[in-house]
A protein has these predicted regions:
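Extracytoplasmic and endomembrane cell-envelope/extracellular-matrix remodeling and assembly machinery
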Residues: 1-26, 30-31, 70, 75-78, ...
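Alpha-helical scaffolds flanking conserved acidic
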Residues: 34-41, 58, 106-112
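A structure-centric signal for secondary-structure junctions around beta-strands
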Residues: 37, 57-58, 148, 222
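Short, surface-exposed glycine/acidic/tryptophan-bearing loops
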Residues: 50-72
Length: 271
């Protein structure tokens, strides 16, 4: 009998792959990228869209502020699309393609650059006098030297879970179908939850990009609210009434330019 794995975080990762894996795979396939890259956000964030490193890297794909902005992600007081699984995955695909092309299709070097920045990788290549990752590796930062082998190991573990003795401690929840509604008015999470008859926690879980439990209005085209497909009809029907509920608690939203100071570090890459 296979052992039941209960170590901290594994069930959450397995659940995350079950719930988000298809979305990531679809994006990778659409961008003609290796499907094994779906395990990269497992290594980066444990598939937690709210993950934030001590250096400020944020979201599933752990984008720094400068990299996120270079990939056209919205980052302001109300919205941080680095935390949006769909938007950040599209940005990650664009970024990974750029790194792949930069290193002539060598994924070992491209992934090292994803972790350490192309500046650090190019410096290591010059010092090694080679573009063979395994020769370049000893000139890379310690974390990056371990990063690519760790991803290779992770791919094997999750592609061959029986061989590795990995099984979840409880059955995984089935994937559920999601839909998106574009909102042009300010809608609080509690109002959205009231309209669709779902808990606020579900709204928050499906919409991690909003920083203040509010979908902000005032933008051409509106901002997306992600919800389960079976909740769309009830939500649209009940939304007008829900917007009147405790309307005085809904804050005014403005998108004035923010001043952000970022200190450039050796090896940083803009995108």
């Amino acid at each position: 009998m296979l052992p039941t794995v209960t170590n901290l975080g594994l069930d959450a990762v397995l659940y995350g792959l079950s719930a988000r894996g298809l979305t990531v795979e679809e994006a990778l396939d659409r961008h003609n990228l290796p499907l094994e890259l779906k395990y990269l956000p497992v290594l980066e964030s444990g598939l937690n869209p709210l993950a934030r490193s001590g250096a400020g890297a944020t979201g599933l794909w752990q984008f720094m502020y400068a990299t996120g902005r270079s990939q056209k992600l919205n980052i302001n007081s109300w919205v941080d699309e680095r935390r949006d699984p769909q938007s950040s995955t599209e940005a990650a695909c664009r970024f990974l393609k750029r790194l792949r092309d930069m290193y002539d299709g060598d994924w070992h070097l491209a992934l090292a650059a994803y972790n350490a920045g192309s500046g650090n990788v190019n410096k290591a290549i010059r010092r090694a006098g080679s573009r063979d990752f395994w020769k370049v590796r000893r000139f890379l930062p310690r974390e990056t030297a371990k990063y690519v082998p760790s991803l290779i190991a992770l791919v094997y573990l999750f592609e061959h879970p029986v061989d590795a003795g990995l099984v979840p401690s409880q059955p995984l929840a089935p994937r559920f179908t999601l839909d998106t509604v574009m909102l042009r008015r300010n809608v609080r999470f509690d109002q959205a939850a009231r309209a669709m008859g779902r808990p606020v926690a579900e709204v928050a879980q499906l919409n991690p990009q909003y920083r203040k439990e509010l979908i902000p209005g005032g933008v051409d085209g509106g901002w997306p609210l992600v919800l389960s497909v079976d909740a769309v009809g009830p939500f649209l029907e009940a939304l007008p009434e829900a917007l009147e509920w405790e309307a005085e608690k809904t804050p005014e939203v403005s998108f004035e330019p923010e001043v952000t100071v970022y200190r450039v570090r050796s090896g940083d890459v803009l995108g």
